[in-house]
Amino acid sequence: MAEGTAEAPLENGGGGDSGAGALERGVAPIKRQYLTTKEQFHQFLEAKGQEKTCRETEVGDPAGNELAEPEAKRIRLEDGQTADGQTEEAAEPGEQLQTQKRARGQNKGRPHVKPTNYDKNRLCPSLIQESAAKCFFGDRCRFLHDVGRYLETKPADLGPRCVLFETFGRCPYGVTCRFAGAHLRPEGQNLVQEELAARGTQPPSIRNGLDKALQQQLRKREVRFERAEQALRRFSQGPTPAAAVPEGTAAEGAPRQENCGAQQVPAGPGTSTPPSSPVRTCGPLTDEDVVRLRPCEKKRLDIRGKLYLAPLTTCGNLPFRRICKRFGADVTCGEMAVCTNLLQGQMSEWALLKRHQCEDIFGVQLEGAFPDTMTKCAELLSRTVEVDFVDINVGCPIDLVYKKGGGCALMNRSTKFQQIVRGMNQVLDVPLTVKIRTGVQERVNLAHRLLPELRDWGVALVTLHGRSREQRYTKLADWQYIEECVQAASPMPLFGNGDILSFEDANRAMQTGVTGIMIARGALLKPWLFTEIKEQRHWDISSSERLDILRDFTNYGLEHWGSDTQGVEKTRRFLLEWLSFLCRYVPVGLLERLPQRINERPPYYLGRDYLETLMASQKAADWIRISEMLLGPVPPSFAFLPKHKANAYK
């Protein structure tokens, strides 16, 4: 999994019970006048919340009880004490072992956010799209065709303004839009703003979608992978000499001696010049399917010194990447996509490959454990999507991926790893990059031995996260080891990743000699970090400015996922997941010492206004309250528990 799958947000309840007294080690140094206790913090929000809203329910479930995390994820409050109050000496051996487990990873078994109250009365897509033809599904259609009946059961609008209608002149979701009052006539007909339509305003260009015909071919296994099968046959015939395998594409700044002379292709029978044909051609006839591109013919990846937004699972969606691009991110990468799911034509997996027009340097990240599926997937992507590079995820730490041989496990499977890299390099026409960790075990580093091999296999660029799989986020990233790896990887470019939350952190990272830096959790805590690094300053951003960023995210989300009920709730879900990271940011004006460090837990504090205090809350109920400011009230049966749980401060 990518960097963003970190056990990111704090546990519900916030940072420790430190009052206005002395700060503990590992606690953010906030000015004394802003410090408070846990009880006073929540009393303040409850009192102000009652003044600002008439809603009585301030927690995640309709009964008003805060959603508890699964039993396996709870941790003891005090050292030496078990969950049931016994001391470790008095506890049974089995109980003692259970309490020693660190809280990490995902909140498994959490309730799904998918609403179900509208699934029973869904309007037919033919009516939504105002199709003049008959129903798309014919007599087998199970959807409603009575617009009046649908409007009777449809939930109330969430607001008076529709972003899609105001931006593009027409809302494609028609009567199903949750803001339909802005563009719907009383009889249910969708309005169109003629001025915007006359100017030809269209929604932003989003590329790399999955064609329906290709999806059917993938599901029926009718797609041929000649180039991938040819590469796999070479592996089955035995080890290939290094000189006979193309070295791939090197990034700019990595000098290589490449033979760019003409490649000799053995001539077979019947290779004489064919007679001219009276049939006209519709374009140039290439031989890319027969003759592989030489290394010097491939596109090059020149991102030296640029700011690279990490491929963040769950939170690194397209609307979030648009936010980061606006603040100065140079390179973006899609969320981790599983190669087997892509080969099966799963729409949810192909959605991770979508690219917005503002992403000028964009790549996709693949995860897989076997050369055949990874090579075939690389060939498929080279024919169907527009990307600047393809990244292999060798840093995913979760058990689901690791136990199948993918992610970090590839660092210990050098033969399979080599076949994956060489096979993908042979079928791709764009550079191939790799993201790795320092190793699998906490005190056993592997990266310095693996980097020279990756360079020889033809990898264009490597990103090194300065932590091992077992370490996760309980300790700081090892930038001293990253500096050693820079020398081992030379002349191959190496990007560093880990614990960058300020421009000072970025400057220290660049002093290690890395080609550039990748930013992951820092971008989730404050996406304006890219601006701070480029302008070399601390930005004391106000709460209203932060709310405007969230409003832009919701607008981008409605454009991307839709303004109907399903799209609104999907936007809300990803907003809440992001808020579980944003709440850990401490405003610059409240800190005694700059900058904020990523491993320092924010204590309970009262901000300079109500909104700043609300944004500092670690309770999911308060995140929901913020979402209601932007997307209206939640459904009656709404429940939310963050996907990831933090142990970064332990």
Curated annotation (Swiss-Prot):
Listed SUPFAM superfamilies: FMN-linked oxidoreductases
- What residue spans carry the Basic residues bias annotation? 101-113
Q: Where is this region: Disordered?
A: 1-24, 46-120, 235-284
Question: What InterPro entries does the database record attribute to this sequence?
Answer: Aldolase_TIM, DUS-like_FMN-bd, tRNA_hU_synthase_CS, Znf_CCCH
Question: What is any one GO biological process for this UniProt entry?
Answer: tRNA dihydrouridine synthesis
Query: What is catalyzed by this enzyme?
Result: 5,6-dihydrouridine(47) in tRNA + NAD(+) = uridine(47) in tRNA + NADH + H(+); 5,6-dihydrouridine(47) in tRNA + NADP(+) = uridine(47) in tRNA + NADPH + H(+); a 5,6-dihydrouridine in mRNA + NAD(+) = a uridine in mRNA + NADH + H(+); a 5,6-dihydrouridine in mRNA + NADP(+) = a uridine in mRNA + NADPH + H(+)
Identify the catalytic residues. Answer: C396 (proton donor)
Q: Which cofactor does it need?
A: FMN
List the C3H1-type zinc finger ranges.
Answer: 118-148, 156-186
Q: Which domain of life is it from?
A: Eukaryota
Q: Coiled coil: which residue ranges?
A: none
Entry-annotated residues carrying N-acetylalanine: A2
Q: What is known to happen upon mutating C396A? A: Abolished synthesis of dihydrouridine
The intrachain disulfides are none
Which Gene Ontology molecular-function terms are recorded?
Answer: flavin adenine dinucleotide binding; mRNA dihydrouridine synthase activity; RNA binding; tRNA dihydrouridine synthase activity; tRNA-dihydrouridine47 synthase activity; zinc ion binding
Q: Which residues carry this modification: Phosphoserine?
A: S236, S276, S277
Q: What is its EC number?
A: 1.3.1.89, 1.3.1.-
Function, as annotated: Catalyzes the synthesis of dihydrouridine, a modified base, in various RNAs, such as tRNAs, mRNAs and some long non-coding RNAs (lncRNAs). Mainly modifies the uridine in position 47 (U47) in the D-loop of most cytoplasmic tRNAs. Also able to mediate the formation of dihydrouridine in some mRNAs, thereby regulating their translation.
UniProt lists the family membership as follows: Belongs to the Dus family. Dus3 subfamily.
Q: Which PANTHER family match?
A: TRNA-DIHYDROURIDINE(47) SYNTHASE [NAD(P)(+)]-LIKE
| Stated name of the protein | tRNA-dihydrouridine(47) synthase [NAD(P)(+)]-like
